[in-house]
Amino acid sequence: MNYYGSKELAAAFRTVRKNTITIGEEIPEEHYGYRATPDTRSVGETLVHIAVGTRFPAQIHFVERRGAMAGFDFMGFLSKITAEEKAPRSKNEILQLLHVEGEKFAQALEGLSEEFLGERVDLMPGMTPPAKSRFEMLLGPKEHEMHHRAQLMVAERALGITPHLTRQMQERFAAMQAAAGKG
């Protein structure tokens, strides 16, 4: 019995995507070109990278249903994604892309069987481990998004914005302190 299945995977992904969209909404469009360092993605580029980041696992697991990665044209696929990331977009277009791509991926996750999630996929020769379950591989997009969302939260701080999750935590602590003081 699996206690964390497709519905939980989809719900967790939706939560992560909702928080990413909130960050995108809170950063003013004039700061979408901000880069923490010259050799990093801008805020806007990072948000688009996150938005289209689900296309790789979708191709592997939902379109091709690959059992092995050998023979997959990773560089060809990556070049298409990279071109997509470079297309100019407004803040609203980026937020819409995040929403649409995120919901499409979450819906695909939601309907997966436990059997499908348990299937092993052989990775590229020489990789360690040599294979992973689809479940582990499909956790990857959420982990990838959280990695880049942390970068966006640092950018928010550099731009003078307190991230919404930090504000929410501060509000909870303040409420607990106020309640403790009344006792």
Q: Which ranges hold each PLM region?
A:
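Alpha-helical transition-metal enzyme core signature, strongest for iron centers
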Residues: 13-20, 43-58, 88, 95-105, ...
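Membrane-proximal, proline-rich intrinsically disordered regions
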Residues: 27-28
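Short acidic/glycine-enriched loop/turn segments that link adjacent beta-strands
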Residues: 40-42, 125
